[in-house]
Regions:
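Bacterial Sec-dependent N-terminal signal peptides
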Residues: 1-4, 8-63
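Acidic/His- and Gly-rich active-site-bordering loop/insert found
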Residues: 59-167, 177-194
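Extracytoplasmic/secreted proteins, especially bacterial periplasmic and envelope-associated proteins
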Residues: 64, 71, 75-78, 82, ...
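Soluble non-cytosolic domains of exported or imported proteins
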Residues: 70-74, 87-98, 169, 173, ...
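Divalent metal-coordination and catalytic microenvironments
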Residues: 83, 121, 134, 172, ...
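Metal-dependent amide/peptide-bond hydrolase catalytic core
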Residues: 106, 286-422
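Histidine/acidic-residue-rich, glycine-tolerant segments that coordinate divalent metal ions
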Residues: 156-167, 173-174, 185-186, 191-304, ...
């Protein structure tokens, strides 16, 4: 995600298989793998859900499958700790992808590298059915880990010209281990799987560096959903900030789009003692920053969906007594409606252009769309609710959730096929 969620230090966990029953109005069935993590400091249980959706799954799974899933627990713990101790940044997940690819091939799952460091695995079940994709992100963040865990990350690397630590601070190590465990379980019950399961181990969810391509857009561009053609896509994310033991969902728009913008204001350099001889781009920039917020508060219909415009960086000048020629600011735009996203772009461009003109300056705006709105297909959500409720242990643990203004590039999969993100 395009914001960092720091997770509690996690230790051992167990794995359970929850049987699902066919809902009256749907053939959709869901195999749910529930991961119980126990946090070391608080000794509390963190319930993490990975959804493995299958159509027309038999109503009564043999008890032996419960034993099969439980037997995988030590491996999943080991994998999670390995990836936590050996994190790699976006588009640099070379060893991570090699390990994933090799293991999928050991299981007899067709596997190939996609998007440079991503892995796509294909498991063809023994029964006819649709093609269901399951996605886990695999990249880490430039964050230094500070704790005493035996499997803490001591990895360092160069990032933007600085030496930084590398850490799975957003839980992607857990996502990898959970999907690898799911792949092993399904490979061992292959004859009972109706349809085809596509495992998407995606790099660069946190964003590819610089001008590089990566993440879900590149996975889609290189055909990760096309061969075979995927019918539905499921994704999830662990979240330490939510109540334990609950599954959170929302039909329709769920997570925000994310656009990154750069505004360059060109003025006229002069001495600070003679400001009337120049055009101050810093003053112009301050006016622009203030007026960007009136786009949100006075120009957008916030009863439709939230809009957030944030300026997070501004650079100008080299000396305190010289008015510089140029000021550059950077920021982000968050929206939960595709139409509003386009409207905000237009209003930003008009606002910047007109304010600059008032002061005799010029300004250039560039906007780069990083993610789309993450949209949960309402019909697919409705079909999945009975199974999710079963997995959660009752309706009180299945929680309708609100909009999330964080962003996820999972949204690009939903642009190609019906999708759900929990």
């Amino acid at each position: 995600m395009h914001y960092v969620k720091f997770l509690a230090s996690t230790g051992d966990f167990s794995l359970e298989l929850v049987r699902s029953k066919k809902t009256p109005d749907s053939q959709l069935q869901t195999l749910l793998c529930i991961f119980l993590f126990q946090t070391q400091p608080m000794r509390k249980t963190l319930l993490l859900l990975f959804v493995c959706p299958l159509f027309s799954l038999a109503q009564n799974l043999p008890a032996s499958y419960d034993d099969l899933v439980k037997s995988e627990t030590p491996k999943v713990v080991e994998w999670r700790r390995y990836f936590h101790a050996n994190p790699e940044l976006s588009n640099r997940e070379f060893n991570t992808s090699k390990k994933i690819e090799a293991y999928l091939k050991e299981l007899g799952i067709d596997a190939r590298i996609v998007a440079n460091t991503g892995v796509v695995g294909i498991l063809k079940g023994g029964k006819p059915g649709p093609v269901v994709a399951l996605r886990a992100d695999i990249d880490a963040l430039p964050v230094t880990e500070r704790n005493t865990l035996s499997f803490k990350s001591n990895v360092t690397t160069d990032y933007n010209g600085q030496k930084v630590g590398v850490m799975h601070a957003c839980g992607h190590d857990s996502h990898i281990a959970m999907l690898m465990g799911t792949a092993e379980v399904l490979s061992k019950m292959k004859n009972d799987v109706p349809g085809t399961v596509v495992f998407l181990f995606q790099p660069a969810e946190e964003g590819p560096p610089g001008t590089e391509e990566g993440g879900a857009p590149l996975m889609v561009k290189q055909g990760a959903l096309d061969n075979p053609k995927v019918d539905v896509v499921f994704g999830m994310h662990i979240e330490a900030g939510l109540d334990l033991g609950k599954i959170y969902y929302k039909p329709g728009a769920f997570m925000a789009s994310s656009d990154w913008f750069t505004i360059k204001v060109k003025g006229k350099q002069s001495h600070g003692a003679d400001p009337w001889k120049g055009i101050d781009p810093i003053v112009v920039s301050s006016e622009i920053i203030q007026n960007l917020q009136t786009i949100v508060s006075r120009q957008m219909d916030l009863t439709t969906a939230p809009v957030i415009i944030t300026v997070g960086k501004i650079n100008a000048g080299v000396r305190p007594n010289i008015i510089p020629e140029e000021a550059v600011m950077e920021g982000t735009i968050r929206t939960l409606d595709g139409k509003m996203q386009k409207e905000v772009h237009e209003r930003i461009r008009n606002t910047v252009k007109n304010i600059a003109a008032v002061y005799g300056a010029t300004a250039e705006v560039t906007i780069d769309t990083k993610t789309l709105v993450t949209y949960n297909d309402p019909k697919l959500v409705a079909q999945s609710l009975a199974s999710l409720q079963k997995a959660a242990g009752g309706e009180n643990n299945l929680v309708p959730y609100h909009w999330v203004t964080g962003a996820e590039d999972f949204s690009f999969y939903g642009n190609k096929a019906p999708a759900i993100f929990f």
